[in-house]
Structures are given as structure tokens and as C-alpha cells.
Amino acid sequence: MQKKEADPWYREEDESILEIYDIEQGTREVVREFDYLIEAPNWSMDGTCLFYNSNGRIFRLDLATKETSEIFSDFVTNCNNDHVLSPDGQSIAVSHGTKEDGKSRIYTLPLSGGVPRLITPMAPSYLHGWSPDGKTLAYCAERDGEYDIYTIPVEGGEERRLTYAEGLNDGPEYDPAGSEIWFNSVRTGLMQAWRMKSDGSEQTQMTCDEEWNTWFPHVSPDGKNVVMLSYRKGDLKPAEHLPHKHVELRLMPAAGGEVKTVVELFGGQGTINVNSWSPDSKKFAFVSYRIRGEN
């Protein structure tokens, strides 16, 4: 078995710390620690639970009791860290590596558990956004060797390509109004946050950091703020999104403006891949990591 020194993706010795950051108080709160890998929290629409993936499954954590329970997903047992809750809080869409070829495809299922429904037969497809009206999913997909952003009706059907720029375009997520999609793109050299209309028009660069590669811009429910994950330039290639890095969570106004660091942590992949804002827009959840046996 490869150890972490030889394989940057070796994570069997990861321990996970599920945390919440309060943007008004500027404080971090540890929700619960795990002696294994968990990733990518989503905050429930009623504010009572967090949902995360671990070992290919989706779990619910009750914020009052800190108890966890697995969401029954039948044959979908290889979920990655790209999953999103529906706007009505009744369903979850997940990205699952199918047994046939191991490639990620998007499925939806009841949040209470149930038999998943395949949405994207074409693969790989990695989910990131669900439109506020509940009708459309947005995702990153590799087609003919290019990773771009696509949308598809939530019931399935014909997918629509929104980006054509060379290089990785990833992490599409709707703003609360549903009129715009935030995403990250490497098209200008480093990974940066971008915004476009929901039909793919008016693609606009929102960060112009010369020292950072910025991933996964998540818009708060009130539409005022965006939290992003940033790697320092030189720590990896611009299109890489690795674990086991010293990274920063950074906040900026959704209208554009100064970007400020609010959290420094050890993590990266799995820390905040999907939207994790609380319904009141005052907090967001994330995962930091440590390697077992290391301080």
C-alpha cells in the first residue's frame, strides 16, 4: 500500500475536524472530531443538520445532539464530495462512481433516503449547483478531453454546455436569485473565481489574485458574501485540488471587492467543495484535517 509520502491522495490516516465559522463573531467552533475521513458539509435548509460524505456514503449530523446517521441510498455507495441539497430541503443530489466504469455520475434521491434516480448518463459528471427554482442542476463534466460547466434539467434530459474556455472550468453554483452562476476557472493562468449569467453569457473574472489559486466560490443565501478555498501559488499546479495542504478560506463581497482571509487550516480537498452556508448566512461549515500520529 502506498503511503502518504509517495501518494498525495493517500488519506487512510486522515482525521477530520468538522467546524463552523461565524462571520460576525470571527470565531471557529469545533462541531465534532472523527478519526477517519469525512468531507464536504452541506447545511440543511432548516438549520438543524449538516450532511457530509464518508466512505462513499452520505451522512446526517444533528447539530443539537452531534449524533450521525447514514442516508439510505441503495446501490449508490461510492459518493464523492460533490453533493447538494435541493432548495426545498426534500432531496439530495450526489455524484457517484458507478461500478461499471468507476466514473462519476449524478443521481437524486429523497433526503430521508430512498432509491436514487440517474440524471446524467454521460460521465464523468461532478455536481455543484441546484437552481433556486429546483428545476436545473449545474455541474462540471469531462467531454472529449475538456472539463467544462454544464446544466441539465433535474428530471434528466439534454445537457447544455456553458463554458468553452481552454483548461479546467469547475465548481458551478447558482446565486440565490438563480440569475447567475459562480464557478472557478484556470483560463487566465491561475485558478480564479468567476461569475456568469445562468445561460453562460457575460463570463466575468471576480478574483485576480497573483499569489493564490482560488476554488469553489460559495454564495451566501442572502446573496451578500462569497467564501472560497485558496491554495498558495507554488504549492501545486493551478488545476490541482489536493489534500494535505496549508490553505485559507477567504471571504469577499458578492458584488466584488476586497478578499480577506478568515480561516487558515490544513486541508484542501474535501474542506469546502460544496455550499455549506447556514440558512441565515451568518456561518459556514468546513472540514480541517490532521494526519494520525502527527501534531
Task: Label every PLM stretch briefly.
Residues 1-295:
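Sequence signature of WD/YWTD-type beta-propeller architectures
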